[in-house]
Structures are given as C-alpha cells and as structure tokens.
C-alpha cells in the first residue's frame, strides 16, 4: 500500500447563540478545531472570537514540518502575549480555547488535544477510539453539581441556577486553574506557557478517518460515527435533544445550546 494522507471530507461549525466562538482551520497538512471561551471581563463582547482567529493566523506563520507540533503551538501562543495582556482583563484572565490539531506526514498523523475537544479515530474494521482529555470536565462538573444542588433545594430549573452567584464564583475559580500543575491545559495567552502537551503519533495504515469535534457535540459520538457519516444529521439530532430539555434539568449544562463544531477527515492515498 502506498503512502496515505488526510483529506477534509465534511466540516460543520454552528453557533449555539448569536455568536460562534468555535473555529475550524486547515492549511497544508495541518487541521484543527478550536472551541473558544471568552474572558469574564464585563463588556468583553465575545473576545474569544478574536483570540481563536489570532491563534490560527499565528499558527499559519509559525508552523513548520521540521518543528515538533507542541513547539508550533507554543510559539504561536507566544506571539499573542503582548496583544492579550493580562492587565486588560478582570483578574488577569483573558480568553482561552480548547484545541484539537492533527498534522499528517509520510503516512502518519500527530494528534494534540488541549481542553475539552475530542478526537474520534475511525478504523477500517468499524472500530472507533475516542481520545479525550478529562481535565476541563473535572472542573465543569464541580460547577454543574453546585447548580444541580441548588435546583434540588429550591426547585428552580438549572437554566436559572447556573446563574447563581455561588456557581459564578466557582466558574471564576475554575478559570484560575488554566495551565496550573493541578489544573487543566488549554490555549491561553494570559497564563503561564504550556509546560507539557501529550502528542500522539498514529499510523494511518488501517484507519478510515478521524473526526475532531468541540464539546458542543459531546455525547453525540454514536451518531457522529454512524455510517454513512453525516455531520448535518448529527447536528440536527443534537439541537432536537437540546430543544426537549430547555430547562437543562435532564442534561445539566451551562447553556441551552452550545456552539457545535466537527471536522471529518478521511484517509486517502497520497
């Protein structure tokens, strides 16, 4: 068998509200999904949108095939530190983003995940391997559990209890754990540089493709990987599930509908 490579087969990125803070980017042999989170500064006006765009622009300049993937990511972040000065943000916490990035070279792919983006690796024999960092989910669960307890105590729907001041305080505390030793790794220009990243090196031999997705598609993996793959079908199913749980009580979460982004890459001959 000759050398294999990755090709964009389908891509979808839809907002959960008025503004989409997710982004898909691909250039050459590099492909990525970003899930932005705006700062908590009053009047920030979705500053994650500018952050994820700035990162991809920087990455397009910094990334080279002869550099390790984690070096390309760190150097891209370093160029943004002056633009996203911590002094501009409440408690020094600027916008951030989860990341799933794949680089393909000579029949292999490198995969790097930060935050709560997910990779679904599809084998030609029908198996799926889900690759996901549980770091952000650990902290989100603390805030969601708090909102659920207030719901049980007061009878208010979780749609309202997630705005409780105690829950907000917990969310702020979570943000302070970005890129801390006991916290979670994520793209941020206002925290310490990333000291460690886990890069997987995976042969494309025996693979059918890979799906990168933001957490807006969490718990939708069974449909995302159902053949024939149809990201539009999965998206419609997601929004219908959300519509039937407008109070957030059945599936506790921070908003009725999150931004939902997925990138499906097929393995094809080079």
Predicted regions and their residues:
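PP2C/PPM-type serine/threonine phosphatase catalytic domain
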Residues: 1-270
